[in-house]
From Swiss-Prot:
Family annotation (NCBIfam families): NuoI (TIGR01971), PRK05888.1-4 (NF004538), PRK05888.1-5 (NF004539)
Bilayer topology: Peripheral membrane protein
Name listed for the protein in its UniProt record: NADH dehydrogenase [ubiquinone] iron-sulfur protein 8, mitochondrial
Cofactor requirement: [4Fe-4S] cluster
Gene name of this polypeptide: NDUFS8
Signal peptide limits: none
Binding site for [4Fe-4S] cluster 2: 123, 152, 155, 158
Entry keywords, A to Z: 4Fe-4S, Electron transport, Iron, Iron-sulfur, Membrane, Metal-binding, Mitochondrion, Mitochondrion inner membrane, NAD, Oxidoreductase, Repeat, Respiratory chain, Transit peptide, Translocase, Transport, Ubiquinone
One annotated GO biological process: mitochondrial respiratory chain complex I assembly
Amino acid sequence: MRCLTMPMLLRALAQAQAARAGHASVRGLHSSAVAATYKYVNLREPSMDMKSVTDRAAQTLLWTELIRGLGMTLSYLFREPATINYPFEKGPLSPRFRGEHALRRYPSGEERCIACKLCEAVCPAQAITIEAEPRADGSRRTTRYDIDMTKCIYCGFCQEACPVDAIVEGPNFEFSTETHEELLYNKEKLLNNGDKWEAEIAANIQADYLYR
């Protein structure tokens, strides 16, 4: 009688397992081939007409864009907010900001405006009206300087045309009113604005001096 050693037993077990695996794969292929010939009851094939294809594409796109939008929202949820709590907080203004108009004076208190009327001529909205008379010393000064702020388009041409930096557009942008008449500025109103913002206006002009 032949005695079986351990290596022989292991080899026999490996051959038996390989044979079983081969039979299983053959059965799987056979089952797949048979299943392909089955007729499934109530199986609805997707319609391939243009309307159905378009509807399916639209639904897919809708959900895709919806998920992308939600993802974008969540990505900004924990970031630093870009908005500020206006009017309690205010953002920085450029030195070139064009806001409410003002007429400036020299440090001596003398009006800068020499009544050349260049600002009146250059204004594309025809919002500026100037009247002037000569003084006893021969210099010309304005007797009337009106700006209709409802016409002004804040182009800054008046400020650029002025040879003595008399008319400027100041840093104030909060000058809403309840009546139309309050937006018709006269010379006194403009000079008061200039006196109020002179330090800031002078600093802005100096900051922008190299680019003028």
